[in-house]
Amino acid sequence: MQAYTEIAPPTAVSHAITLPFLSSRSNNLIVAKNSLLQVFELKSTVTEVASGGEGEADNAAANFDTEAADVPLQRIENTAKLVLVGEFPLAGTVISLARVKALNTKSRAEALLVAFRDAKLSLVEWDPETYNLHTISIHYYENPDVPGLAPWDAELKDTYNFLTADPSSRCAALKFGTHNLAILPFRQRDLAEDEYDSDNEAAQEGKAERANGANGDDAVKTPYSSSFVLPLTNLDPTLTHPVHLAFLHEYREPTFGVISSSKATAASLLTHRKDILTYTVFTLDLEQKASTTLLSVPGLPYDLTQVVPLPHPIGGALLVGSNEIIHVDQAGKTNGVAVNELAKACTSFALSDQADLALRLEGCTLELLSQDTGDVMIVLNDGSIFILTFSLDGRNVSAMTIQPVPADNGGNILKTRASCSTNLGRGRLFIGSEDGESVLMGWTSTSNQLRRKQSNTAQSGDDEDMSDVEEEEVDDLDDDLYNDTATTVKKITAAAAEPTAPGTYTFRVHDVLPSIAPIRDTVLHPGKDTESLTKGEIMLSTGRGAAGAITALNRELHPTMLAQTELPSSNGVWAVHAKKQAPAGIVADFGQDAEANASSDVDYDQYLVVSKAWEDGTESTVVYEVHGNELSETEKGDFERDEGLTLSVGVLARGTKVVQVLRSEVRTYDSELGMEQIIPMEDEETGNELNIINASFADPYLLIQREDSSVKIYKATGDGEVEDVEATGLSGTEWLSASLFQSSSFTEVFAFLLTPEGGLRIFAMSQLEKPSYVAEALGFLPPLLTMDYMPKRSSAKATITEILAADLGDATSRSPHLIVRTSNDDLVIYKAIHSPSRSSSDLWTHNLRWVKLSQQHVPRYMEDGAQEEAADEPGFESTLLALDNINGYSTVIQRGRSPAFILKESSSAPRVIGLSGNPVKSLTRFHTSSCQRGFAYLDSTDTLRISQLPPSTHYGHLGWAARRMPMDAEVHALAYHPSGLYVIGTGQPEEYTLDPNDTFHYELPKEETSFKPKVEHGIIKVMDEKTWTVIDTHVLDPQEVILCIKTLNLEVSETTHQRKDVIAVGTAIVLGEDLATKGNIRIFEVITVVPEPDHPETNKRLKLIVKDEVKGTVSAISDLGTQGFLIMAQGQKSMVRGLKEDGTLLPVAFMDMQCYVTTLKTLPNTGMLLMGDAYKGAWFTGYTEEPYKMMLFGRSKHHLECITADFLPFEEQLHIIVADADMNLQVLQFDPDHPKSMGGTRLLQKSTFHTGHFPSTMHLLQSRLHMPTASEFTTSTTSSLPLHQILCTSQSGTLALITPLSESSYRRLSGLATHLQQFLDSPCGLNGKAFRAADVMEGGWDAGTQRAMLDGGLLMRWGELGEQRRREGLGKVGW
């Protein structure tokens, strides 16, 4: 019984599409990351771009008129940034996205059609009222009774399934199975008026479709008609081997082109099956469910893989192969271009020769740049960018030309291949990648600029002033072409007829979506030093090709410590920056004094105020002057230092007045700390003195909360006087929490107040007579908080102790959020939305709603009771604090025993990330010349730490602190040496040339081609952990590839039995498929050398002590036993070896395997060994040292394709978790007493869990926590056993934990999972339980009653429920 929990979401972008989704006038980007759907909007910012800047294209010529010869070195450009609107985890794997102009959507925009791996289609729209996806319908076709599915056909998971949609939204087609096509028609407005209905002969579809009214009288209410499955062989009997299809532009009826053949294509059969592909165009009759063949082009090259439809003026489609690109127009006329020498050998089709380009088009992506010219961008497998241009003769294509984009024009800004691309309009493209970071890039064209300048249209002079939406309407590539006038067609055709000159296009990176996919190898540092910045808790090798990198992940934030000092008995710190008041008679708004604001130290903090509570009960305040990171105590001014405890310090009156809040009074000072005002706190009716418990600043307002739960508001006038503000709406009411909120998006200041009953009141400072917003149901923590929301039961309320409204975001985008803290330190985050949208003249609270965001942070858990008691002392209570500029972030900090930051990037959701170290008493911003935009905090040890956020670190995309170091090469393996080194196995592609002296290929003719294949040449790099610089490099033999690297503690002397940490490297020498593969095992030791001048980190090198060539690849290495031996998988054997003093490896034991060993894992402190075979499953073996012997204990009884595996011990049971090639986790158990285990020789199959991500590594972890068990199951033996977990990584970039569960915990969590599935929204209408349940192996489960692995991701969504649903769920499971 286990739980699988994703602790980091997928980051590999698999699909992307652009459409107006949020509203009819919006321009949104939809991104699919395997099982995560994200919705973005674009925000334009103004940035400075340096001419010839590093890593970016110099597009100055495209942004200025040709007459302006003296272009400045620094120029201002509009840069587009991605802003996340929402993200939705899916219970399915996305295989395609398509846009549909559906009728009557809630947002009055277009709908999104999502296709999933198991032949499902979901039609979704945006619901502005709930700020969420709304599923219109779901259609599924995996039913084995669907016509056209034969029993011998391949399974759905083994076929290429994809979705394509008609450009005019008349229908969509899902190709699934071997050759089946599911057609889903959509109603059009003109068809709806004619009462078009084809539902009388409805094909078999999902129950969800019928429930939405697909049949009967309600059919006219749905935006779709009944779908039907059409076997491709019904269209043409020769379509037995379809390759690809796509709908085409400019046809009156839905029309698609298909590449297919009647026989299977293969490079090995080229002499017999040359040019056997056929391109056929069919038009569909949706009413008759029939088709008509329009044209057929036979004799096409065998390697064509893709159909790319082109709109007017080019029209037709591009057929993309590995060695050529062919254009077929609407009349069937073809034009092609060969891009390398192999095109002559693989086809006899007539092609123009551009073989000198030597391109490899495998895995390339094509995207239309401009509809005016018809130019197409090609992104190759290595990220290189080329431009395909057309020459027109009238309206016919006469020739095609491919040109490379020079590096100076941005041709190398992409590091790896693209998985998807989409055109966002206005010269912006999104390039998604599964192998590295995804890029939002911009392009400009000098020819377009000149053409636009010479145009006489009125819009040409107003382009710069047009809004994003207006310009998008002009540049939309998907506009209906039927309404184009003849004049427009003539202009576009003339533009396309002009050939594009080389160097015309210039590309520049606008924004980046960070990615850690694919994860290739992992190094763990569970006990790392908290002060180390470059040594993450998890070190990952990520990316492919030139996008390869090393990424350091930290679960908590480890700030850069600049200085620290001891401040005994302190409990509060505040940094203060005060400005001198302007002379009398001069009134200047903040920000208008340009000269003063431009000075370098205009915002630097001058004072640090520290409040202290001594052990004898006395309280005092100390003022320090700040000089960089140095503090010096000062007696300057009249600042109150001895009378009472300082509760808060802030500034008012545009920063000219310093305000000190004491227990019983408020004092104001000038910029030199000279006394100006004393405001006592007294009861207005009785005159009794009242103590202050909280204060909140929002210039020019000050909110004071007093011990009788009353609230007073003060305002700084123009002359600096702080006066009481009459607030009749606030008087006579008790308030549990109160704070002020001032956003960067509006000027009004609001007061957020919490009633003891859990109600929310928002007051505008300009209207304090009554609240501008009332939400009585905040205490119920509903998923959507509105003014009129009220649940049926009024008793199920959460205990809310504090609320705080603040902007969250970065320099690009900030938005208001409401943070709610409960009595057990849980944080609930609400995002402010407006539905319907408000006008700019309305108050911000008009039509305001709050949407609860999903967040999975759990407060810090402490098992040490003494520490917990200490954390409850005065000064350790949790409080929230909003800071507006911490290294560019607008953030909220939670102080107390579980300190945390709430951080958000513009393209990510808010994430709660804990602050490492001790509990935090107080925290303040700290901005000086030595600590730019940093912070200072006081921890439980009375240490003041002046810190900054770590540089070049992302937080929001993973919920981890992630720092990436590019390696510019793919990293295959990674290991850590205790001397402080990382050993990295990389490779460099190089051209392969046949050896003229090769005796194995004597029958081959002499090689004459210049277009040679590329093979990898392995390189070992050594990186210092502190500086992240490469200090040593070892180049391996030609064609030698690194497969694994491990740090082993081996015995290096047979006489003294000395042990030493060494580096073992396993490699493969790949000579071709017709020769046996060899491998090498290399053993390196780390030696100390004389460092290079000024580089002390270069004092270590690797020294080769063993190099042993073996038959077969060395695919896995591990340490074994207690005598310092190693075990290695060499070919089809697993062999135990010992290191001798003469530099040789002595074999002492071995075991024969069957195919290819993918993993070797040992259980620490035992002789147990787990070996995984790529085709034959898992082997559980043992090793003994007296005598040296290996023995087989048990094997999996099914033929698993084992990718990786590991042990999972729990209590007195031993489980084995195997990750297979179908993205499943197989749970096996070694139980020799079970009758089905045949005496232990067969591992029991306990359960199967589908992850949806292709696995890469597994690592056994020992947790610092202990699993809670019911008292009746607890024994003195099991209670002391440590809890183990398995960390899983995947090629999608996910991190996941597999946690074993006790019987009682499993039963309760299983009940909660059932409760959550019932009440949580499932995006796209998918079944989460069915998604996680994999197919049952032959022979069924061995556990009698199957105990499926729990979906921890579902359980972590517990916070999305309202308090009423939570209590219902807890009541069902007995909590």
Swiss-Prot record:
The keyword Thylakoid does not apply. GO terms for biological process: mRNA processing. The keyword Nucleus applies. Keywords: mRNA processing, Nucleus, RNA-binding. GO terms for molecular function: RNA binding. It comes from the Eukaryota. Pfam families: Beta-prop_RSE1_1st (PF10433), CPSF_A (PF03178). Residues 461-477 have a biased composition (Acidic residues). Residues 194-219, 446-477 are annotated as: Disordered. Disulfide bonds: none annotated. InterPro entries: Beta-prop_RSE1/DDB1/CPSF1_1st, Cleavage/polyA-sp_fac_asu_C, RSE1/DDB1/CFT1/CPSF1, WD40/YVTN_repeat-like_dom_sf. GO terms for cellular component: mRNA cleavage and polyadenylation specificity factor complex; nucleus. Belongs to the CFT1 family. RNA-binding component of the cleavage and polyadenylation factor (CPF) complex, which plays a key role in polyadenylation-dependent pre-mRNA 3'-end formation and cooperates with cleavage factors including the CFIA complex and NAB4/CFIB. Involved in poly(A) site recognition. May be involved in coupling transcription termination and mRNA 3'-end formation. This is Protein CFT1. The gene is CFT1.
